[in-house]
Amino acid sequence: MNIKKQLIIPCTLIGLLILIPIYSVVVNYFKSASTLSLKSTLTEVNLFSHLGKIVDIKDFKDTPTLLFFGFTHCPEVCPTTLSNLLNNIELLEKNKKNYRVLFVTLDPERDTINILNDYLQNFNSSVIGLTGELNEINKFAKNWNIYWEKVLEGDGYTINHTATVFMINKKGNFAGTIAWGESDKSIELKLKKLLNL
């Protein structure tokens, strides 16, 4: 019994030593994300849409936006995320709310304008693909605290990356996130709030 009591304090301290840094990282992440805006990050870079047009922040004025980073060779996470988002939004489309989904490639080496254009034919016209020079993509992704890493795979490579969807309100400011694997009910509630339904 005494041994158990003696272990409680050390174990508690060890637990706190582990949890405090994790908590700090999470809090700092959301603090930095909450100060982001689409305007401040898009105007710093030169990106092109899948239609070959230079991206202009004016195109997204007064439009709620969902921002997602991925790549066209992504086998599961990217197509599933885009499909789930659009399926949930379709349930709300009867309200005729305008919105945009920005799909930013983390693989501009392969994801040219033409490749992005072909890939996005699988989704509806609300999805806009963005690509550009690698340094421009890197800058934009880092501004949104995106983790990504090229991983060799067979004769080619894949990319491990953050699978979070960023919600941006019609003022262009960060309004929350949708996590990979989040339930449809949770996504629906968040989208209703974003779209003011």
Regions found by a protein language model. Name each.
Residues L82-F140:
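Structural microenvironment flanking redox-active thiols in thiol-disulfide oxidoreductases
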Residues V55-D56, A175:
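Generic structural signal for well-ordered beta-strand positions
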